[in-house]
Amino acid sequence: MKTLFKKIATSAVAASFAVTAFATGPVAADQLTDRVAAGETIRIGFSNEPPWAYPGENGEPLGFVHVIVLGALEKMGITEVEPVVTDWGGLIPGLKADRYDIITGGMYILGSRCENVNFSDPFGVFADVFVVKKGNPKNIHTYQDIKNTGSVLVTGAGYNIVEFARNEGVPSDKVMEVPGPTEMLAAFMAGRADAIGSNFFAASLLVEKSNGAAELSDPSKLPDWALNWGGIGFRKADTDFLAAFNEAMGEYMGSDDMMAKVAEYGYTSDTLPGDGQTAYACANR
């Protein structure tokens, strides 16, 4: 692949995961390309969202999204990054405030988000699902079920679930927003919520942690519009870097190396996104 970057030096300071690189192509035209050309660290922003993206014991970026992102960056000659962990609801504001350079948290590509950031080509296609009480006594499978039973839905602040529930007419006082998965499960287990709204991967982990008190709803009963593509978020101005990243990710996506590394997180060939869905998702999600 003809890349924009060629790595020539790497910092030995493990805590910063710093990278030193220079551009081999034309003079940089955007902030992130300039940053790499100047030998500065690329900062990746994410929250604690296993198995998508989360920090390890030493702050290192783990999860299947980071396998894909780091694999693509490596093809661009960038092998180390600086992780920045924040709450999910602060990811887009943090990118716009220049606290990091890329959002690697595993965001769905939604029209409301596309107004604020540019997304990469998709790294996967995903279904949402509800975590419900064992036996699903309220028969909750859709947003309409939440609405019609007067159930309380808990989800993360800034999650797509909030927007989808609102669009489906679930009253705002029946949607509880909390910082993340730990708080979502706590509210559910304490009886403050009847269902948890999340993506299939994260919801499956919450069921495992419920000690047999929960199960998953049937995701096939949700409408087609609830199917979503995940993307990596970039500043609007960083178009040159995004183009190079998309090229590199396209080469890495679905490779034997990638599929071997993401398997431990539950990502399979069924999750692969297909081609060219970013514009469609921005317009239709």
Stretches with model-predicted labels:
Residues S16-V27:
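C-terminal segment of classical bacterial N-terminal signal peptides
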Residues A29-G106, E115:
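Extracytoplasmic small-molecule ligand-binding "clamshell" domains
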Residues P55-E57, V69-T79, Y159-P179, V207-G212, ...:
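Ligand-binding cleft/hinge of the Venus flytrap
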Residues V81-P93, K138, V175-A190:
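Short helix-initiation/N-cap motifs at beta->coil->alpha
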Residues G90, G106-E115, F164-N167, D194-A226:
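A ligand-binding cleft/hinge motif common to bilobed small-molecule-binding domains
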Residues V125-V131, E208-N246, T268-R285:
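Periplasmic-binding protein-like
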Residues N160-D173, E215-L216, A248-R285:
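Ligand-binding clefts/hinges and TM-proximal coupling segments of bilobed small-molecule sensing domains
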